Amino acid sequence: MTLHLKKVELHCHLEGAAPPELTAAQARKYGVDISGELRGGAYVWHDFASFLECYDKVSEVYRTEEDYARLTETYLDELAGINTIYSELIVSPDHGKRIGLGADAYISGICEGIRRAREKSGIEARLIVTGERHFGPESVIGAAEYAAKAGNPLITGFNLAGEERMGRVADYARAFDIARDAGLGLTIHAGEVCGAFSVADALDAVHPSRIGHGVRAVEDVDLVKRLADLGTVLEVCPGSNIALGVFPDFASHPLRRLKEAGVRVTISSDDPPFFHTSLAREYELAAEAFGFSDAEIDAMTRTAIEAAFVDEETRKALLARL
């Protein structure tokens, strides 16, 4: 129903996009038992805590620069196959350090995967470096400094992810100042696990152009108006929200309400195979579960390009491909 539509994704965690088949092959390669996390070709978890545990276990089987090149290439090839023209991948150099690969080799592998995929299909991709709240402000500042000093043209944004309930956004404001001063685009996870107040905190402390999720803003009518007035773009991931119980079903999900209130919204998949979804399915849901027309979906894709962390020449080229 929506395969013919051009697609753009602004919110996807790279390790969270690992296809189960590739993960199974990687586990065999390293002799790692992931039978508790991967059964019948699907990732297994039952609540947010076990999702994070499953995510970490899956990430363990990606260890080398080539592993990350292959993971990135595989995901971008999948996107290109459904008419996707642009993708932003959320990546963590800190994760590269923790697994002993190192931040530079981690990023280098990912960039090689982007190069391979683009050579085949023309898909464009950029990287958003993320700090993780649960490792504390100093770790997040380190991630921002890495992104700011990398001098890598594919690193164009900075994000804050991880456990939303760990501290207030103001605790991490210094990291965003560093990223902003380096000319990086700013986005932040808020309004997912925590309520509308976390979105307000993000606006007050960080002044981001985009917010990852942000859907709990619907709980505060004044905040919704503020988002609309500011033109802040929400990276909405409906399948993820339902899978994690942020909302009980698509009928209660606020994507359409937010759009009709004038908030700029886009569609993404977050950690697709973990939530039994894909970018293709998210676009299908936009049509079938939310009743958006092709023109309305195209408008959200256009919003995503307008909000993408790219140079103006690339933005014009992407808009011309719609």
Curated annotation (Swiss-Prot):
Positions of the record's site feature: Important for catalytic activity: H213
E.C. no: 3.5.4.2
Full protein name: Adenine deaminase
Cofactor comment text: Binds 1 zinc ion per subunit.
InterPro entries in the record: A_deaminase_dom (IPR001365), ADE (IPR028892), Ado/ade_deaminase (IPR006330), Metal_Hydrolase (IPR032466)
Record-listed substrate binding positions: D271
Annotated keywords: Hydrolase, Metal-binding, Nucleotide metabolism, Zinc
Listed GO MF terms: adenine deaminase activity; zinc ion binding
Any Pfam family matching the protein: A_deaminase
Cofactor(s) the protein requires to work: Zn(2+)
Family membership: Belongs to the metallo-dependent hydrolases superfamily. Adenosine and AMP deaminases family. Adenine deaminase type 2 subfamily.
NCBIfam families found in the cross-reference section: aden_deam, PRK09358.1-3
Taxonomic lineage: Bacteria, Pseudomonadati, Pseudomonadota, Alphaproteobacteria, Hyphomicrobiales
Catalytic reactions of this protein: adenine + H2O + H(+) = hypoxanthine + NH4(+)
